[in-house]
UniProtKB/Swiss-Prot annotation:
Cysteines paired by S-S bonds: none
Organism of origin: Klebsiella pneumoniae subsp. pneumoniae (strain ATCC 700721 / MGH 78578)
Record's protein name: Small heat shock protein IbpB
Main location: cytoplasm
Transmembrane spans: none
Amino acid sequence: MRNYDLSPLLRQWIGFDKLASALQTAGESQSFPPYNIEKSDDNHYRITLALAGFRQEDLDIQLEGIRLVVKGTPQQPEKETTWLHQGLVSQAFSLSFTLADNMEVSGATFTNGLLHIDLTRNEPEQIAPQRIAISERPALNS
């Protein structure tokens, strides 16, 4: 029997908390760039990408249907550098996140090498639970 680890796929599904947390494991692989997804409450999320060496002009964020795509293309140095040790990676990347229904990007900021993308879940009124008042008058057919 083969075991398939779906956690690398599920960690990029934002707003599908029950599904993602049920299948996600602690030993998930990390891709470039490193990122966090935090949940403030049931309706507010934040994706934070660590982008040392990138400038704001090097970054592009697009929402394509339910896919949030973040791309980065760093500026190439004018002069070739000879590295004795290179621990900081500055390479082109493209990351995509699948958003749940009714998730919207509410804003993005780039400060101190960290790109923050804020997401909000906006439930339409017809989907949100409605409280039905109970009256004291008799029913129609009684």
